[in-house]
């Protein structure tokens, strides 16, 4: 037991056992042969996937894959260095230019992940002790970013501009919010949040990971979808691994903002640049997403079908106002109930992950249904039937808010 690894394991084992006992233990299963809507499980059975983020079905589209293969042959499998050393390539510059144009901003900067992009933004713009207002349901990366920056978080009630205004004063530097909230699928009231921020001189930062490509004209995201002018959101964060089906993230804004991030954003400076071939694939995916509006139209039709069916069946699915997103949570309450529902759906060949604490508050465990443009009406109907069966077997104890 004197071995360092054994001592470390001895400290970790009780924590892992406690997590298993609480029904919160997590594990990953390798799925194969993903085609945008279905995949093959580890037991060899094909299942329909309703819990991914590939909203437009571009992860399995052959065109970004061809771009990736072509540029990998020309540029190799990796960048070989950080952007500011020798890792920056023409593919990165082309993608940044496309993203700036797509979002209506002067410039954009690539990051390896959305988590790193949020860390880079907040740690660059906030100094230790400065106040930052944040929605209480923000993504973990935004919450962690404020902590790591040494900022003083001022949380306001979810999507509540009035409470935000009460929490703000002229010492607050930033207001940070998700554009589309990843666990509830609702959209932030951006014009009202912007007005509250502007009243005290704070800058509004929007992480639109789940909105870009999906809602708004040409998939422009939550900013145009809510009627908010781009200049009222000085900092926009987006990801490339969700609606665009590839990998990576970016920040879009003024040239001055992007220059500042290039100088001081440690997650950008101290990491290897994304593979150039990956940037080429993302560029192709963004162009496809902008051009092929039928993907969003079909997706919206599926969302409407699911919401209508859930309402008719009495399923606990929230029906919030505002733009409709592919994230449709089915609220059940206890973690054990969510796990039982997920297992029943899995038995029927439908993969929907149970979302449990600490990802969501205690007592609000759910199945987070995510629809994609590759699903069919028949897929949605089969999902609704399975959810109704799961509800009969293990009734939910949490009613969905209206």
UniProtKB/Swiss-Prot annotation:
Q: Where does pyridoxal 5'-phosphate bind?
A: 114-115, 182, 210, 239
| Top enzyme category | transferase
Q: In which pathway does it act?
A: Cofactor biosynthesis; biotin biosynthesis
For activity, the cofactor(s) needed are:
pyridoxal 5'-phosphate
Which Gene Ontology MF annotations are present? Answer: 8-amino-7-oxononanoate synthase activity; pyridoxal phosphate binding
Reaction(s) catalysed (UniProt annotation): 6-carboxyhexanoyl-[ACP] + L-alanine + H(+) = (8S)-8-amino-7-oxononanoate + holo-[ACP] + CO2
Q: Which UniProt keywords apply?
A: Biotin biosynthesis, Pyridoxal phosphate, Transferase
**Cited NCBIfam families:** bioF
Its subunit composition reads: Homodimer.
Q: What is this protein called?
A: 8-amino-7-oxononanoate synthase
State the organism named in the record. Answer: Halorhodospira halophila (strain DSM 244 / SL1)
């Amino acid at each position: 037991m004197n071995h360092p690894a054994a001592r470390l394991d001895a400290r970790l084992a009780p924590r892992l056992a406690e997590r298993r006992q609480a029904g919160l233990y997590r594990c990953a299963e390798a799925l194969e042969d993903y085609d945008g809507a279905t995949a093959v499980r580890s037991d060899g059975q094909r299942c329909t996937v309703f819990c991914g983020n590939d909203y437009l079905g571009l992860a399995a589209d052959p065109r970004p894959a061809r771009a990736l293969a072509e540029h990998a042959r020309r540029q190799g499998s990796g960048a070989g260095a950080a952007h500011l050393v020798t890792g920056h390539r023409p593919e990165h510059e082309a993608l940044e230019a496309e993203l700036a144009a797509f979002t209506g901003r002067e410039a954009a900067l690539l990051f390896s992940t959305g988590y790193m992009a949020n860390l880079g933004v907040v740690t660059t713009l906030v100094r230790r002790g400065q106040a930052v207002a944040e929605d209480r349901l923000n993504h973990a990366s935004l919450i962690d970013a404020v902590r790591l920056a040494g900022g003083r978080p001022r949380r306001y009630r979810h999507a509540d501009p009035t409470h935000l205004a009460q929490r703000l004063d002229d010492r607050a530097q930033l207001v940070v919010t998700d554009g589309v909230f990843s666990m509830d699928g609702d959209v932030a009231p951006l014009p009202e949040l912007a007005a509250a921020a502007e009243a005290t001189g704070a800058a509004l930062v929007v992480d639109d990971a789940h909105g870009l490509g999906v809602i708004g004209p040409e998939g422009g995201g939550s900013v145009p979808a809510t009627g908010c002018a781009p200049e009222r959101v000085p900092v926009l964060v987006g990801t490339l691994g969700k609606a665009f089906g590839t990998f990576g993230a970016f920040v879009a804004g003024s040239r001055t903002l992007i220059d500042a991030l290039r100088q001081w954003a440690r997650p950008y400076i101290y990491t290897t640049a994304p593979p150039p071939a990956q940037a080429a694939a993302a560029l192709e995916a963004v162009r496809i997403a902008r051009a092929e509006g039928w993907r969003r139209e079909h997706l919206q039709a599926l969302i409407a079908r699911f919401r209508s069916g859930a309402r008719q069946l009495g399923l606990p699915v929230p029906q919030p106002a505002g733009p409709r997103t592919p994230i449709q949570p089915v609220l059940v309450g206890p973690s054990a109930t969510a796990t039982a529902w997920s297992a029943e759906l899995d038995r029927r060949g439908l993969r929907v992950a149970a979302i449990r604490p600490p990802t969501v508050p205690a007592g609000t465990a759910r199945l987070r249904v995510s629809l994609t443009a590759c699903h069919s009406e028949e897929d949605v109907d089969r999902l609704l039937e399975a959810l109704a069966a799961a509800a009969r077997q293990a009734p939910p104890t949490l009613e969905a808010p209206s």
